[in-house]
């Protein structure tokens, strides 16, 4: 299955001209508010043949035949439109290894290349529509049959930029703004504006955080529903369920531990990151500090800030060293743990 790309189209211009555009491009199945790419850049029915290994094999064989037929040279393409069937049959009698169905597919693909520049629908659609399928993803919620200035649909793998450029050539007085976003949230997203067949404005999110927020807006997602949370620096989103950390008790409160050297870029907003220093012999943790250079013993994540006072660190005794409880939690589970405990207490009450 492909990655789905959501497309939002906003139209600006004379309402009657917009209505005319929507009538021209509508899908016969879905009506006003939908788009049929064939109404904008039509695809020949002869291209609608099987795309895959059988066609590839047949095309290779048919090209071998053309080399033999033209003596590996060139010939006027008009003459190649009327190749005698007898010539093909002579070649096939010599090549008994060829499957007849693959031969016919290859022959059709070769003719499509000659006439349309692509062997099958697949390559033609990628080249002429910018995506491999027609628009899809319609529902009663996304098609507005009354208001006439917004379109919503999905495409496979990529946005249909050639289609929209052609559409604004067909209707030069209408300005079209196109926003798109891949379901791989934060990737393959942006905004183009078109008028009179020309792209007049481009926008791409500048940061990872901006890209995630842009995509979530188009898909109508809450980042938290995708287990994504903005990091403490506000520069990127962190997946809360990808990695597990060791559970510890630190200064009498639950915390998480990892051997890695974390920064605020690695933890979600609402949590705090500190560092453990181990003794010179590496036998025990001797302190927790905001930053540790030498003898770094690991990073800890807490739900509350630690007050280090004037000293700038907190030393451990044998009784106050971090206690490893033996469990593991993701960042998401750690964030939710207090809420779960409160819920359990309420149930007991």
What are these regions (language model features)?
Residues 1-271, 275-283, 293-301, 309, ...:
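Intrinsic low-complexity, intrinsically disordered or marginally ordered coil/linker segments
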